[in-house]
């Protein structure tokens, strides 16, 4: 290699700086790309583009639920309840894991058939509730603030103290009563 006239030590620092700059550029590009992917895959249109979720979204109990029809006009979308957005890494991880899980479920089960979906509805509702319990109601609290609950006493006192989650009492997806008690 011909000598460029730049001392070896200086070349080494230039190479290190170039690698750090390249790593930063790749990292920033990855964050920007994943943020855009998160945004694009968070719409109700995207979520219901597969047969399974179209069946769930069309369910009359869900369409009549408070998250779809309420007095203040707020319409909760799929990602409002299913994707925690308080942390970019957790949001991206949740999109990735739930996306893979949903694609596998779509390809291995015939949930677009309402009879098949109804036969497994309680089981699927329990899985959804368990996920929401594990995330300690973080998605519920995007819209419902514990501090806004008038006098968090009685039933809401354990919630305010972090001893229970919203879905321990409140059903989601207008779930059947059997799923609410599990």
Briefly describe each language-model feature range.
Residues 2-182:
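Short sequence/structural segments immediately N-terminal
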